[in-house]
Amino acid sequence: MPDFPDFDVIVIGGGHAGCEAAAASARFGARTALITHKRSTIGEMSCNPAIGGLGKGHLVREIDALDGVMGRLADKAGIQFRMLNRSKGPAVWGPRSQIDRKLYREAMQSELADYPNLTIIEDGAEDLIVEDGLIRGVVGLTGQRYGASKVVITTGTFLKGEIHIGAKRIPAGRIGEAPALGLSDRLYSIGLPMGRLKTGTPARLDGRTIHWDRLEMQPADEQPIPFSFLNSEITVRQVQCGITWTTPETHAIIEAHMNESAVYSGAISGRGPRYCPSIEDKVNRFGDRDRHQVFLEPEGLDDHTVYPNGISTSLPEEVQEKFIRTIPGLEDAVILQHAYAIEYDYVDPRALSPALEVKLMPGLYLAGQINGTTGYEEAGAQGLMAGLNAARAASGKDPVIFDRAEAYIGVLIDDLVTRGVTEPYRMFTSRAEYRLALRADNADQRLTQRGIDAGVVCETRAAMFHVKHRALESARNLLKTLNLSPAAAVRNGWAVNQDGRIRSAWEYLSYKEICFDHLAQVWPELSAIPAEIVAQIEIEALYSAYLDRQAEDVAALRRDEALSIPSDLDYDLIGGLSNEVRQKLKSVRPGTLGQAGRIEGVTPGALTALLGHVRRVRKAG
């Protein structure tokens, strides 16, 4: 066997979490290895051919702001860009794109192949090397030992993964690929709290056999907006998606065979994603509906495969054939790959610190579906943070942790390590208390400087960020120096309160009825401001009054987060706690008073008792 030098960080798994983890670690400067079964599956999109969406698009922008790879590669491979939620406020707009699977996979493999400080190793991970309770590396399927002081596990659905199609059970991490067994056993042996979750994927159809002329078609946006702050336009050819619906006949077939579904037959014990239910779940839970929407999503520009989003199932193949052909437009559809459900092991993320490090084993980090999440974007965000924090720890530096007022990444990780999961977790804008500030449009202004300070942002992005930051500051300052009386505003056709108070152009821009073009008619010098800067300034001004009020809430959050709790605190010594609250605090071991307050069931009275005890301990110490 070839000898490998010791690495600073080893990342196990070449999916979306693993790719971001390996890239972030390498960008920081750590000697990094990515261990994956096959180079050819790095960057594979195992389920839907899409990136972004409501909440998820915010995560992609944040990954990009920290110089991650997902957004840039999605721009290279995106074949139908759409901004979701346009009818609502900009804070909840969700960038999304259909993705050409082949283009994305090839772009990811090309990106990582020449990444400085990164070595790709084609092998499986059978076990961890542990000495004196500390991580020392990884043992491959070949028996090869790879040394490292930090290891990031990003195994997706591979931990004891098992595919279900009707009564069939197939050990697999995904279709056609073996599961990871030894690694799962090792995690159990560490004493980590673990469980089973499930997810599913629909059949893949031959687009040449679909009656597209019978369907409603959904085009891309006329002016696609890129994910990456480094890109100003999309050059990939855009395509349309089809929309169809299930029928009462579809539902009748599914109901007649419900007991043959792996989920309803009892073959699967793990819970599936609430917000991405199988078609059996939809029929069972929403019996009053006579149809459910199905999006027919092309998987590539030169690929005839179509992904029917909305009909994932674990029913037998012959039942799938029957019910699919009752859907308008799919009467003659040929199935290229049947749908399946997959059940897999996960670790209760409350076993992790906010740095995504395993509390019981320093040096071991987890990211992605192993932590109970679902989705490429959630995986990528965790991967970036786990990889960065592993690399920083390897060089003796403190972890980077975002709070809930800084980033959706902060919301995601705090939810996981504080509240845990009982079903696959996905991001929504509604999970963020400070979503008016955590917008997709300003992710770079929120996070890129933090990334620069953390050592994870390249010089090119840093330079572009500083140019944009200065342009925004200049535009804001100019708008705040230009003033107009209410009487003059009315003469320009603006409906404003005639209170005699002179207002700045910035204040006028906060009125919904007044846009930047209106201001430029009064102050022609504003026309010189670039369109990109104008777009963000308009959004900032619109929310300015709300953001000023929200600043008090953020300050309160930061005060609570500043009150740290010793990691070895003996909760049995705290009076006034119920047994339930005491057990929850022991399980999570919150690092701050703020985190303790977000644990389900922890009351204000319990927080007061906890705070008093911590202060007494500090005073005595």
UniProtKB/Swiss-Prot annotation:
Q: Which SUPFAM superfamilies match?
A: FAD/NAD(P)-binding domain
Cystines in this chain: none
Q: Which cofactor does it need?
A: FAD
Q: Name one GO cellular component term.
A: cytosol
User: Which keywords annotate this record?
Assistant: Cytoplasm, FAD, Flavoprotein, NAD, tRNA processing
Which GO BP terms apply? tRNA methylation; tRNA wobble uridine modification
State which residue ranges cross the membrane: none
Outline the subunit composition.
Answer: Homodimer. Heterotetramer of two MnmE and two MnmG subunits.
HAMAP family per the UniProt record, alphabetical: MnmG_GidA (MF_00129)
What job does this protein perform? NAD-binding protein involved in the addition of a carboxymethylaminomethyl (cmnm) group at the wobble position (U34) of certain tRNAs, forming tRNA-cmnm(5)s(2)U34.
What family is reported?
Belongs to the MnmG family.
Q: What is this protein called?
A: tRNA uridine 5-carboxymethylaminomethyl modification enzyme MnmG
Question: What is the organism field in this record?
Answer: Hyphomonas neptunium (strain ATCC 15444)
Q: From the UniProt record, report the name of the gene that encodes this protein.
A: mnmG
